[in-house]
Each structure stands twice: as structure tokens, then as C-alpha cells.
Design a protein with these regions (language model features):
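Glycine/proline-enriched, intrinsically flexible loops and inter-domain linkers
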Residues: 1-243, 247, 251
Length: 254
């Protein structure tokens, strides 16, 4: 990897999406083999995780959406990603429902007497105090100068327990921020990295609730029992399922 990175500095300019050749398939999700069967386009990875940017099996969606897909006139602008298929996938998801593998999103469970104090200091939004259990808070971490350091969601699991979900490439940086603040201030809080223990899928689109209702009790996920920015635990085929209602009408399942 060091050699590959050096080529982007000491040789002529390379494409910003030029894929790495070395150290591939370091981390893959439980859905990886199925994604490959669907023609997943895995040229690029994120923080060591293989991530499909589109699925060739969805090329047929271009029949419906081709007129809405932007034309990229330069070859350089179409390299390494099948943008036409990816655009059609997004348009189809906006009309109906789509599922995105987000297993590369870092997950950290934070628990302890000082968990609230630590997250309250680092977060812009209020995550402690009278914030109810099961509430999901979208927030930023700020640096000492007030600049945005991280963009993430925090779920309050119990009085002294939280789950932090951050961006795909930002997990180590945000973990270091949390660890350093805890250790520098002598706080009592356990930071448990769960990324490799939990598979995560995002369900997006106006028919997301309808689709999910085919597998679990629809009453469990209606707007009254599962409001916006809330989290709850359910069971799907005897497997534990952690649901987050993060946007409307979206469901995030881990």
C-alpha cells in the first residue's frame, strides 16, 4: 500500500478513484458472495472494506431511467464506476425501495458512568440529560476551535449506554478522539468496537416500511410505534435485529 500511495505523488497524476491492487478483501460483509453473484462492482474499497458501488444485474433499470441519467461526456469521468447503473439504482430506490450494504460503517458501543459526560462534551447535539432511551441523535463532534471533526449518529441505549455509528472511512479517527478524551480526563467509559460483529443494511425509499413489513410485524414499525429518529430491538428469523429509523421513510437494520 505504501508503494501504491507513493505512485500518486511521484508519478504523473492518477485518477482519484484509481483502485488499490494490494491488500484487497481485508474485510468483507456476510453478503459479499451474494453481492458478487449480482455483479457487484468492487473496484474500490473503504478503510479495507470491500464495497460495491453498483450492481451490473441492475443494468436493466436503465430501460426505465435512461432519460434521467446524466450523460458523462469524458471517458475520464466514467472510469472505475458504472455511473449509469448507479444512477438508475438511485432513481429506482427513490420511486420504490432499495437496500444498501452499510456493513463498513464503524459501530462503537460506549458504556459506563462517564459515557454521558464524554459524549455530551464532544457532541453538538444533546445526547444525555433527559434524552430518552431509544432516541437516535444525528450530531457532529467539534474540535477545540469549534470546527467540525466528525459527522455521526448516537443512539441512547440505556442511562449509561450509547451506540455510535460513524462514516465508513472515519472509524479509527473517531475512536481515537473518544479514547484520547476519555484517557486524558480519567473518565470511566468502555469503548467497544462492534463493526466486525454486526452486519448493517440500509433500507431506503417510499416503500421501505412496506418491504420490511413482509418480514416482521408491520405494527412494530408503524409511525406510532417506531417514530422518526428512534431505535428498537426486534427479532427476524430468530436473529437479533437492531432497527434505527434514521430518515423518512428509511429503516437501518443491524
Amino acid at each position: 500500500r505504501a508503494f501504491e500511495n507513493s505512485q500518486t505523488i511521484y508519478t504523473p497524476a492518477v485518477h482519484p478513484r484509481e483502485p488499490y491492487i494490494t491488500q484487497r478483501e481485508m474485510f468483507v460483509s456476510p453478503f459479499y458472495e451474494r453481492e458478487k453473484e449480482l455483479g457487484g462492482h468492487f473496484e474500490n474499497e473503504v478503510a479495507g472494506w470491500e464495497r460495491a458501488l453498483a450492481y451490473i444485474s441492475n443494468r436493466e433499470k436503465l430501460d426505465k431511467y435512461i432519460k434521467e441519467v446524466p450523460v458523462r461526456e469524458n471517458e475520464w469521468d466514467t472510469r472505475h464506476v458504472p455511473y449509469d447503473v448507479a444512477n438508475a439504482e438511485h432513481l429506482a430506490m427513490s420511486d420504490s425501495v432499495g437496500m444498501i450494504n452499510l456493513s463498513h460503517f464503524p459501530i462503537m458501543d460506549i458504556k459506563g458512568p462517564d459515557a454521558e459526560r464524554m459524549l455530551e462534551y464532544l457532541s453538538v447535539a444533546k445526547v444525555g440529560g433527559n434524552t430518552p432511551e431509544g432516541k437516535v441523535i444525528y450530531t457532529n463532534f467539534l474540535d477545540e476551535d469549534g470546527g467540525v471533526h466528525a459527522d455521526l449518529t448516537i443512539s441512547r441505549i440505556s442511562n449509561d449506554s450509547y451506540r455510535v455509528v460513524t462514516g465508513g472511512a472515519d472509524g479509527n479517527r473517531d475512536w481515537v478522539t473518544l479514547r484520547n478524551y476519555r484517557d486524558d480526563n480519567g473518565l470511566n467509559a468502555d469503548i467497544n468496537i462492534r463493526t466486525h460483529d454486526i452486519a448493517t443494511l440500509g433500507l431506503w425509499g417510499p416503500k421501505a416500511v412496506e418491504a420490511l413489513g413482509n418480514f416482521i410485524n408491520p405494527n412494530e414499525i408503524d409511525i406510532e410505534n417506531f417514530p422518526f429518529v428512534s431505535a428498537k430491538n426486534l427479532t427476524l428469523n430468530l436473529s437479533g435485529l437492531s432497527l434505527i429509523h434514521i430518515s423518512e421513510p428509511t429503516r437501518l437494520a443491524s
